[in-house]
């Protein structure tokens, strides 16, 4: 079982991405195809020890950067690392792929070369949101579809339930619709219609949830569905708030020698909190509903997040997540 890793598309060059992929090989027994400029990748690989039978170096001469138009770039730059990684999945050389590059380009490449699972209307991005305790909450759509119809949201609920069961090991995930109030009649025309559709599905639907519920502040929920416009704003706001809290805490500690002494005593606790809230722990966000495993990472992905990403892609393939999605979408006739 081979995983394609786009090593050229991150913000800081290929070395950290390659390091994470090699760690996945050494520590998790993964098999990876590193997709990028062959000579440069080969030189970096000389810095590491690993089982050479588990690592392949696939040449790709081009790179799609963050400023390129996704729909144009994936057609014009067919020898780019993200397109070549997608092609490895399309031709069944690899069971899945990971790219920390241009999100739009990764989505466009997956849709163009992998296509959708039969019956899936629109593939959503499923992003894990860290929680105080236990596994993360799953937010979808986190940015793939800015405008959604009610049946899209109903399908998101089904796909999110499957992901939460198979990857986070939640036996009966609680599913909610993100809204401006928890009352059944709150929401807009799309969410109200989606509410009625999801209510009829054989899932554990808890109704509308508010923004505070995403962080354990109210209603208990495991999967939250919304359109990609709202979802992406929520995701970016969450990332920014998490960084801001730690920055404020750091600056406050600097103001007092007593606080600095206390911080030394609490260093292990702060480390544990930061680890729990660190998106690197989850590898990235899965593009659900495409006919192949496609995990999208942050542009600033470090070695740890890449290693975790390879693990998530492997688990999705082993647990046949796409087969489950295809079966349930057909069964529920959404």
UniProtKB/Swiss-Prot annotation:
InterPro entries xrefs: FA_synthesis, Phospholipid_synth_PlsX-like
Name of the molecule in the record: Phosphate acyltransferase
Disulfide cross-links: none
GO CC terms of this entry: cytoplasm
Family designation: Belongs to the PlsX family.
Subcellular location: Cytoplasm
Keyword flag Lipid metabolism: yes
Source organism of this protein record: Leptospira borgpetersenii serovar Hardjo-bovis (strain L550)
